[in-house]
């Protein structure tokens, strides 16, 4: 549904943000 898509996007965004903080380029 819509919520699963939204939550999936948020998780993906959060994961990318964490990776950027933990392993900056």
UniProtKB/Swiss-Prot annotation:
Write down what this protein is called.
Answer: Antimicrobial peptide 2
Q: What does this protein do?
A: Has very strong antibacterial activity against Gram-positive bacterium S.aureus and very weak activity against Gram-negative bacterium E.coli.
The primary location reported for this protein is: secreted
- Provide the transmembrane region boundaries: none
Q: In which tissues is it expressed?
A: Expressed by the skin glands.
Write the record's keywords in alphabetical order, separated by commas. Answer: Amphibian defense peptide, Antibiotic, Antimicrobial, Secreted
What are the subcellular locations of this protein? Secreted
BP GO terms, sorted = defense response to Gram-negative bacterium; defense response to Gram-positive bacterium; hemolysis in another organism
Q: Does the keyword Transit peptide apply?
A: no
Q: Which GO terms describe its cellular component?
A: extracellular region
